[in-house]
């Protein structure tokens, strides 16, 4: 939609749509407790959509304190550098791809809880799973790679409705014209921003 800033709209077909798919697999989050592992753009999108879906409590975990702080405007009730061993959640969504985080998410689930793994998109060491605990605690593990058409539609609708509530546009920390694509890549490598925008055309 025209009223959505380019910077926010640019997040739709990656982080926001993938997050919509993760929430689809997670099921009804209303009044639930949700753990989000990883506070990159995907983790922030998951937190924001869980918040908009009515989750009662959203905890975001990331080893980076600055990323934890960034999660708070996206609906996180708390953000920590490690999982609190005293807390339990109905849903744990891993956006990090780190085996240790996925294991921590399983340990943090309530009986009957659901783990959704989204971040493991590259080859990595296997994740040891305690089958007895999965069986006794009635756990569900679901994986998602990319998103479907319905997820993309929901991502567009979410962004139209909530782009002023959750500051996705602020994640695009630099903007370059298409003619300066090499400079955009160089800037991204040198500074490590959340996102770098490349404008296919500049506003009239």
How would you label these PLM feature ranges?
Residues 39, 60-61, 93-94, 118-120, ...:
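Glycine- and other small-residue-rich loops at beta-strand/loop junctions that grip anionic moieties
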Residues 99-161, 201-204:
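Glycine-rich phosphate-binding loop and adjacent beta-alpha segment
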Residues 2-81:
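Mid-domain Rossmann-like dinucleotide-binding core that forms the NAD(H)/NADP(H) cofactor-binding site
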Residues 84-92:
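A short acidic, Gly/Pro-enriched loop at the edge of an enzyme's catalytic core
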Residues 9, 16-19, 43, 89, ...:
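A general structural signal for well-ordered alpha-helical segments in protein cores
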Residues 149-204:
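C-terminal hydrophobic helical "lid"/dimerization subdomain
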Residues 97, 110, 189, 193:
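Short conserved AdoMet
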């Amino acid at each position: 939609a025209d009223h959505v800033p380019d910077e926010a709209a640019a997040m739709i077909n990656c982080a926001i749509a993938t997050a919509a798919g993760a929430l689809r697999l997670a099921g009804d989050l209303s009044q639930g407790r949700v753990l989000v592992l990883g506070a990159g753009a995907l983790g922030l999108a998951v937190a924001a959509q869980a918040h908009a879906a009515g989750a009662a409590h959203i905890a975001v975990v990331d080893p980076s304190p600055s990323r934890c702080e960034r999660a708070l405007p996206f609906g996180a009730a708390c953000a920590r550098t490690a999982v609190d061993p005293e807390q339990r959640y109905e849903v744990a969504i891993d956006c990090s791809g780190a085996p240790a985080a996925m294991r921590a998410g399983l340990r943090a689930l309530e009986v009957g809880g659901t783990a959704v793994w989204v971040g493991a998109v590259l080859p990595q060491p296997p994740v040891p799973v305690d089958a007895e605990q999965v069986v006794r605690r009635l756990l569900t593990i679901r994986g998602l790679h990319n998103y479907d058409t319905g997820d993309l539609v929901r991502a567009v609708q979410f962004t139209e409705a909530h782009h002023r509530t959750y500051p996705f546009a602020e994640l695009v920390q630099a903007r370059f014209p298409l003619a300066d694509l090499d400079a955009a890549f160089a800037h991204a490598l040198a500074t490590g921003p959340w996102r770098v925008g490349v404008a296919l055309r500049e506003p009239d």
